[in-house]
């Protein structure tokens, strides 16, 4: 499994449409369109829409934003939600043979929390009708947002998610590691504990800690001891500081600011600057109209000297309980 900063052929997305997930749908669509505008210049966009009417409306929105439509491929598919990172395939590469393949894991809507979203488990097979790639199916439950790799053999994940009985009940840590070795080509595992408050995925790593190069990890840190995320994130930070890469080298762990409390009267939302997407030439970062937005952009730019870091307001997108990394799945170039 390549690291996210390795070259992409395309990025896969699914246009938001459900007002249950996105009560501020118009604002969420605007953030989504802004994301496409920024990313399409350096990697092709493969975009799912529900029907011809949605396609026409979406194309019009992108045209207004001066998106080069020849770089957008629109696919009409039946899908429930936009979280491609979790229900989409995880692409893998055989570098000596220059061959691309996909691994198709079982998506059970984060522990069967949302029965209406279970149909998104079929998206990878639908994609492969046109891609026609070799497809490998481990037969176990896993979401792309629960793992983070450096492309050299190391993988970071959380016990809260991968060992959760609502995913693969009865499966041991060693058994899960064996599946990850066999299907993703990793050999070294860094297990963190738990995720952030408001995260319905049971502790996905892409809201906590992200590799930015083979030996450097950005890790969210909450200095406010009264915040429920403080203790959790401090423990994760300490675990990363004590960890090594696949060759036994210590990792450089860089603290990443957190937005703080983002939400409404119904509760806290899983807002995290760590949910950025690493494109071919840009890193797209979710912003939340909080005092730490600027500091987060500065921190992320410092670890990506060869890419432009772009912030996009995702305050209304996060009502769907995710942002840019959650909604994307990169297709590696071979």
Which residues does each predicted region cover?
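The feature marks the mature, well-folded catalytic cores of soluble enzymes
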Residues: 1-334
